Every structure is written in C-alpha cells, then in structure tokens.
Amino acid sequence: MSLNPRDVVIVDFGRTPMGRSKGGMHRNTRAEDMSAHLISKLLERNNKVDPAEVEDVIWGCVNQTLEQGWNIARMASLLTQIPHTSAAQTVSRLCGSSMSALHTAAQAIMTNNGDVFVIGGVEHMGHVSMMHGVDPNPHMSLHAAKASGMMGLTAEMLGKMHGITREQQDAFGLRSHQLAHKATLEGKFKDEIIPMQGYDENGFLRVFDYDETIRPDTTLESLAALKPAFNPKGGTVTAGTSSQITDGASCMIVMSAQRAQDLGIQPLAVIRSMAVAGVDPAIMGYGPVPATQKALKRAGLSISDIDFFELNEAFAAQALPVLKDLKVLDKMNEKVNLHGGAIALGHPFGCSGARISGTLLNVMKQNGGTFGVSTMCIGLGQGIATVFERV
C-alpha cells in the first residue's frame, strides 16, 4: 500500500484490564497513575519511538475533577518518561472523548503540526462518579426533552421507536459476555491488555492481565429475571443490557506515515476518514448512524466495503437500532464486536473511544480485514466515527 507522508498511522495500542468500579482491581489506583503506567509501558514496547519526539499527549476524560482534574493529560505525562518539553491536553466529548483525542492528533498530523502523538483516555468511575459535581442547566428543558440527560431513558425511547424487544436485548447482552469470554480464553486480548497491579477481592496485591468485568455464567434466564433499570413500568432496558460502570484507560501511539517510515516502524493501520454528527438528544444513541455515514462518504466507501465494526455497546436497546439502520444487523455475527463490547467490558467514559478503536485494529489483524469502522453514541445527542484501513 502506498501512503502519503502526512497520512496518519496507528503504531500501537494498549489498554488496562477493565476493572469493576465497586471494589474492583483498580480501587486503590488513581486515574493519573493508571494512565501513566499505560503510557510508559506502551512506549517501552515501542522503543523505536523517542519519547522526546512526542508533540502532545491528548487524553480523554469526562469528569475532570478530583484526581481527574487540572488537566489529567499533563498530570499523567509528568509521571512518565515523556520529557517536560512535550505538551499535554485533556479533551471531553463525553463518551467519545478519547476518539476525539485521536481525531485531534490526526488533524494536527495532517496539517503538519506535529509528527508523533500519544492519545488515549481514562475514567475512574469508582473514584469519581459520573454524577459528581454535575449541575444541569434548569432551562435545558426549553430546548430538549426533559429526559434527554437520562441516558437509560433515551435508550428506552430509541428501542421503542425501532421495535426492539426485551428478548432481543437480552440476547445481545448474552452475546457480549460470551464473545468477550471466548476472546479471553483464546488470548485475543493478549496484544492489547497491558498487565497492571491491582487488588483482588480478598485485598491481595497481584498482577491482572484480564478483564474482571466479564460474566461467563450469564444466561438468557438470568438476564430475563432482571428488572427494568430506568423505567419500572413497561421498561425493557436492564443492568444486564447496559454498559457496565467500570474503571479503565486506553492508549495509542499515532504518527505521520513519513515518520513511521523513517523510524522503520510497521503501523497497524492508517486513518482513512473521521466524522462527528449531532442528533436529537432524546435519541442520543442514534448518533453512530449519521456519523458513520459521513465518515464513509469522506472515505469514498460504502457500508459493504467495511469488514469489521466496533460499536460501543452503551445499551443493547441503542446498539440494535444503529446496526439495523446501518444495514449490518444481519451480518452482526460476522462483522460486529467480535470480542464482545461494553456490556461485558464496561464503558469508562474517557477510555472507550480509543479502546474500541484499538480492539477493532486487533480484530482486523487477527481476521485479515482491510477496512474497519469504530463508532459510538455520545450523551446529549452526538455520534463519532473513524474509518481505518489495515496497512
């Protein structure tokens, strides 16, 4: 494949094991320490990359307060081998934060404003809860439906609009756990999980190299027994068909194709296009549809050209309508989230965009795909998408 000098390539990807937010492996690890460990280990793994060449560390994080405040990108960077001469910024696009971090780095590379970037994101939802310090504007209900800030209810709405049944959602939730468990047993996550020290359920310090969030004993019967989590009267969305509240971080090294060539690095993939889109906040989960359509148009591709998709599983009631309208629902088992998704692995807000993109690249590498799309919905009505081509 012929690459242009300013094409944006992904050199490597790594993530922490996903930990439960309540009493999980990361309960005694701060968000910036988790991030710094990941950055350091990924740079060690890629010793052709000089940390002094890093132009900017761009880190996604949603709730930027407490240990995640005061520009956590810089806080984490200062704890690594990256010198003080490199810059750092923290970005938030809610759920899409670390994919936005990737896009920001890509746009800088494309416009000759840097060659080497470290991007990623973190959310320690056990230490900084999603609602900590949130103060919604009381006038918002004049501009959007009152429940638009309640993500579970927007998923209920989207599922109802598209005729998604409780049974379909339960089957999707089961699939996520089964595929994530299968991927774990087969070593499919080995290249992406950077082992970390953490504490087990008995309080002992140990090294974790697997996700503690996956529930291999999940069954359709156990899912069917769960009560609706958001709408007690007639609701269909449950805790078992929603993304888990977890702690985690993800990281990528990205650079210009020219710099990768100069360093003798074989990249994983090249970014072919990027897009963001807005939708009605009341159906925020629909955002991946227009975002993906935009990105495909910019890449000159059609949906049938895409070999694999990673769609963030915010809710089964949200994911299924998206797959339906992208015309890939009937190909889900061959193309979509082949290693499970956020229902099994969790959705640490600032982490997820880079996480699903990196998992996609590994799926493409393991299965020989050429084109892939990572996409996700974003609270309050947005979508974000990235089209990758394997190099």
From Swiss-Prot:
Pathway the protein contributes to: Lipid metabolism; fatty acid beta-oxidation
GO cellular component term of the entry, any: cytoplasm
One of the protein's GO biological processes: fatty acid beta-oxidation
Record field: catalytic activity: an acyl-CoA + acetyl-CoA = a 3-oxoacyl-CoA + CoA
Subunit architecture: Heterotetramer of two alpha chains (FadB) and two beta chains (FadA).
Similarity comment: Belongs to the thiolase-like superfamily. Thiolase family.
Listed name of the protein: 3-ketoacyl-CoA thiolase
Organism field: Pseudomonas syringae pv. tomato (strain ATCC BAA-871 / DC3000)
Taxonomic lineage: Bacteria, Pseudomonadati, Pseudomonadota, Gammaproteobacteria, Pseudomonadales
